[in-house]
């Protein structure tokens, strides 16, 4: 009864809910029918006699009520069934259901008499509804539908839908019956005894765990020190298989079997077109030269009175043809360099491509394999076995410890304790603890075995050391070979593309050159006819005088030489273009030293985009345009027998052509330069002889035509030469005729000056620049600068003239503002303005051929002015001998200076010591013999006569004395060898590489190993000296500050720069992926600030490897790498500390304001109280100390990894005054904070670990901090003030949105201006725009403290002093690899007084070796007594410098040793080329006299 009543009431609730929710009528009817069923069951229970007797009187009332509910809910069910019939348009059924519902409701109303009013109201409401529905349905059916009304029992009965179910009840459930009152019937004494037994078990466990932990700690430390990974100890199997990446390349080539064939065919076609173009250009040149020669002969025949033949139109057309020819020649020369490099690259890669497309067995054979003896393999196996034992011991120990813990945990003897007497408890404990004895024995045996295992491991590791070294070297070779093969595969497509571009380019050029050749032929024929006509007319007038003949002495020999060289070529070189086979373009030191080939933008039209580095090669020559009469000595110059060496040619124009922005070589050589074997004269002639047949070219600066304009900025390789051992230049083996002068005539006036055309044909008239020196005086020239050289400005020297009045001279050009030159600079000339302080003097005047004065060159990075007064006085006359001294220091890869090898055997010659430019006054007749380099090979521009000082006539009485030099003939070398070397260089011969010496050729031995040549990655550059000690630097900084101030001064410029940066960011971001960061959206604070996949920080030991942090590198050589990250979220603090631990970070910079900390916008991820460490995952962070300054809070934290006893300290620097939406209070605070950060960074070792920087999102304030940090370091290092937008773009290429606000950029600009002003004030220079007047004491008090105050005055923190000292550091010369970095320590300010340098005191060096020595001698050390030494820097000028000199980075025994490289571990581990007992002895080293091997590794 109760169950059914309750179920019916529950079903009623569901019925009411369904009706309120307007469920379907059929569903409501079924629910209502189920209510009827439940109440019918209850009614049956009420009719049960037992129940009736139990209830008594109320049984009738209950039954009546239940029956009323049955009828009522049946009426509801039939009402909704009627609605259902209405929806189905069964109108007869609708009337039947409504009739039934009305009947049942009437029954319910009868049974409801005596019920409360609420029930009566409900029934009345139901009657209204059902009655209304019934009447409406009946009328509709009667009058409209006329459907038959079926009987109710013929309709489908309504089945109930039970939606409720009864839940069973457990009578003993504690929730029903309450807690069990009999649960605690164990006696209290038994509980106490059980507790005592538990303590005994815990004591036993603690004792064993302590022993295990001690042994584990010893084992971990031992294994960490061994650095032996069992997985990688024996990975010899990896070398027996071809790596997957190489297999992919082999598979790709196997489906293209014609790869190499197509490449070779394409290059052969290109060579053919190249040869055709060169032949056509040569034909045009020969036509023009022949025409000019005939013209000269005609004028000599007819005299000056005879007018030139032919109409002026023909001459103008010929001039136009000549210009077109010069233009096409220049384009051809520029393209020929790319063509040569393309062939070199093809020859380099074609072997690798053949290998990759061949059988896999050959590929596998080409990879290095381990060469291990059986003994080595036995050592390996032994080590592996012992390492396996160590691992087995560990596993067993862990297993036994786990068993012990589980056994103790499960041991419960309460049942025994209840039945045991209290006096017997101890005895019971002892018996029960005996069950652990077996496990204790096993554990102690395991611990005891550790010492034996470690002893055996130590012995095995000692034997493994040699094998380990062999395997590591093998791994390096394996990776290197792999990279070379993959690079060759990747270069193939680019080679084919460039080859096709070259063919298209040369096809276009060929058509134009062919048209020009036809035009030149027709014009020359017309000219010849006109000349013949004029000659015939003149011959009729008078008898013709005998025509002078001008033989062409060496032209045929040159052609024979070319043919002979071509026959000498090896088979693989015969497809090279002719200019590569025509003999060496430069002396062999040039081979393999040019800049690496970058194809784009090259001379081929349409070539864009960067391309692969290819093998660097020699500088190609200018097209041969020398005269037919080769360097004939003038009568004014005395001749004497004995060969003379010519200087190696420099590929710069002698005609005043302005070089392009980055010319590789293609400037047309002077038509007046001698070509071929030299004439045996004492000195070069003072001016070109008149017999030259070269045309008087007036070259324009690159006429703008379609063909030339397609040659966009050519490859930047002009004079970018890398020093290194290289073979000596080949010398010709044929004898040279020795003409003997008939007489020594008096000095003659200089010939008529040639006219040069520079730029827009402003003719500079006057004699060729010559330099005259008194007789017998060793001529002093400035030493070649070591390091990047500023190119010479137009500063011609005044020339002596025989006439009383001076002729017009070229005016000095105004010096352009210094601009940074990405291209390597041309080399410095021997004459012209020179800085007065020479850091490294040499006695190699013949090794440094000069440029001609008057050649426009790109503006230098640092301007300088000549110092005519310094060292202008000639030293005492002394005839000293010249010997090849030690070669110059190795140069940085981008240096413009050219070290040449010493030529052959030493020759005694008069000294040409380098010094400042000499006084140009001629003091009388003179003939100073000059030692110059051997003959340039054919088809190569030879040096102009004024490349090396030559004896020149000057007015004065008496004959010109001559002193013939005793020169040894150079050793004969096969000239073809140089051409064969074109492809002999290796991938190391790119920038910074070394070239192995050739057999039997002298070895260049650098006195320093350039850091760029080392394979290791460069660390942070230190600033070891104050770069602003020189006034020139401060003056340059002032000028830069003036222009920098206005860059972002107004809002318009700032908006424009910001717009460009935003557009560049969108462009750069399209090519970079952030797919990994998107997978970890919960770890990103902002969904638009995520790291790029390419440079994100990868966690190595976390649950996953992701953290929102990016590596930001390459902002400045002096700025450490940074990790920009967001502030840690509550769930990523463990990742943050794990990154700090894995990256070995020592400095964390936090740029979050105090307000953000107080509002708890930033989760505290570091402890703030001592003794309260925070645990993040496996790492524990504790606070060691806190120091609060005016600008920041400095916390020293200790980081400890779980289960390790070693702790690591790091510094947490918090800058609290930078609000989230704003700027710091002043730039000064941030600048001081940056100095503090850098000082802390310099304290760590090593210096290549990053600094972690974070703000809120890791891009806004973090970006501004990184930008200003890098810019400040650039200024402190003495580099130019950096371009902030470029730095911003570089940062954003590594992390999007770095420097989020435009205001941040403006703030950084203002802060950098402020910092530069402080640097200037620190050195006593007022910033630009401020008065220079002496400041009063009150004014001085407002300036920043000077260096003395920083050390001695005030309460300056020690970190500030250390930061200042750190700013005085600089990497030594050998470590520099960029011009900008090395210039600060090399360029001398122009304003030094003349007394700052000692006068040169030439002294004779030691006597020479016998001149007949057939082999090259090693360079002689200490042969530089006649060269002025650079003045020492003197003692430190202030306490700050004294303190700076005592830092570990800058300490040395003598202040003059500053700038020398510190000794490090690498100095003892790396071999040094060219060092040994022959190295120069440092005279300023007080310990150098103790042991001759003292300086073996000293750099």
Swiss-Prot record:
Give the E.C. number(s).
3.1.3.48
Q: At what positions is Omega-N-methylarginine found?
A: 785, 1478
Localization (cell): Nucleus; Cytoplasm; Cytoplasmic vesicle; Endosome
Q: Which reaction does it catalyse?
A: O-phospho-L-tyrosyl-[protein] + H2O = L-tyrosyl-[protein] + phosphate
Q: Where are the TPR repeats?
A: 75-108, 199-232
In residue numbers, the region (His) covers: 598-993
Q: Does the keyword Kinase apply?
A: no
Which sequence ranges form a coiled-coil region, renumbered to this chain? 278-305, 377-464, 506-537
Mark out the compositionally biased spans (Low complexity): 1427-1450, 1482-1499
Q: In which tissues is it expressed?
A: Ubiquitously expressed, with highest levels in brain, testis and kidney, and lowest levels in skeletal muscle.
| Job of this protein | Plays a role in sorting of endocytic ubiquitinated cargos into multivesicular bodies (MVBs) via its interaction with the ESCRT-I complex (endosomal sorting complex required for transport I), and possibly also other ESCRT complexes. May act as a negative regulator of Ras-mediated mitogenic activity. Plays a role in ciliogenesis.
Spans of biased composition, class Polar residues?
754-763, 1335-1348, 1464-1473
Q: Which protein family is it in?
A: Belongs to the protein-tyrosine phosphatase family. Non-receptor class subfamily.
Protein name, entry field: Tyrosine-protein phosphatase non-receptor type 23
The membrane spanning regions, by residue number, are none
Region spans: 20 X 2 AA approximate tandem repeats of P-Q = 788-827
